Amino acid sequence: MLVTQQPVFRKFWHAVMPLTELAHGPRPFRLLGEDIVLFIDADGQPAALRDRCCHRTAKLSKGWCVDSEGQACGTGAIQCGYHGWTYDRSGQVVRIPQYEPDRKISPEYRTTAYHCTARYGYAWVALEDPIADIPAIPEFDDAGYRTIFQFYEEWQTSPMRALENSFDNSHFSFVHRATFGVAASPKPSKYELVENESGFYAETVIEATNPVKFHAISGVTDPITTRHMRNAYFLPFSRRLDIEYPSGVRHIIINCFTPIDDGRMQLCQWLFRNDTEADCAAQMLIDFDEAVTREDKDILESTDPDALVDTRRRGVEYSMESDRPGMLIRKHLMQLLARHGEAEVHRGMASAVIPIARAA
C-alpha cells in the first residue's frame, strides 16, 4: 500500500512533532508526501501551514516567527525568510514589509492551513477535516505514572510494517534474541483478540529473559519472567502496548507510526511507568527500549515498505497462524478504504509508478 495515494489517511490526526522541537522557531515536516511547516502562534498553540510562500514559493520553514510589531521572536506569526511576507495560523498573509502600513492586503494572498493541535506533548496534524479523535492516553495526566518521551526518529519503512511487527509474537526469539527473546521458545504465545470500531484489543502472556541488568526494569529477579501484554490497535497507524510484570510494574508504550511518504515513517514513542526514578532510572528504560527498537528497525528497514494490505492479491506475501493480528490490521484498513470509496493503491498498479528510494 502506498499511503500517500490513499486520501482517507489525510482525514486522521497524526503525531508530527514534540512541542519542545518548536520552542525556538518554525520546523519543516513531510506528512503523507506533503511538505508542511509547524510553528507556535501568538497564543502559544502549534500551527501548521503548507511549506510554501505564495509570493515566490520559498519554503516558509526557512523563515522565523515575529510578533505583532514584526520583531523576530520564538512564537507568533511566521515570516518568510525571502521577502518577509508574514502569515497567521490560518495561512493568511497579514503583513508585507514592502507595503505601506495602511495598504490593504488581498485575501487571495494566502497558503494552505491544516488542522493542528497540542496533545500529550506533541503537535498533531490532520491535512483534512478529521473523522476520528486522537487516541486517548489517560496515563499522561495520571499522577500515578511518569511520562518518558523515548523516541522521535525517521525510519526507512512504512507504518504498516511497523504496526504488524508491534503485534507479532513470532519474531521475539529471532529479532530480539540479544535482548529479551527466549531463543529456546520460538513458538509464539497466542493472542486473545477482540475487535472494536477503532481497531482491536489483543492480550497474551509471554516469557522474557530477565538478566540481572534488567531486574530494575521488571521489578523481579527470576532469570526468566513473564510479560502480561495488553496490546491495542487504533486506526490507522497507532498502537498501545501495556506490559505488566509479576511485580505489578507497568511498562506502557504508545506508538504513532507517522507516514512521511511511501518509503519512510516517523517513529513517535512515549513510555509510561507506575514506578519512580528511584526504582528504575529513566535513562535505563530508554537504553533498554532503544536496544529493542534498534533490533526492530534493522529488520524492518530490510522489508519492502509497499506492504500488502488487500489479501485478495495472491502470491505477493504469505502468512502463518501467528500473523492473525497483522491480518486484522489489514482487514480494518481495507474496511476503512471501502467506506470511503477507495481500494488499495500499490506499486504494481499501472497508475502508481512511485519510487521508494531513500530520500537524499
Predicted regions and their residues:
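A boundary/linker detector
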Residues: 1-10
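Rieske [2Fe-2S] iron-sulfur-binding domain
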Residues: 2, 17-147, 357-360
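Short, acidic/polar N-cap/turn motifs at the starts of alpha helices
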Residues: 13, 24-28, 35-36, 113, ...
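C-terminal catalytic domain of Rieske-type non-heme iron oxygenases
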Residues: 45, 57, 131-360
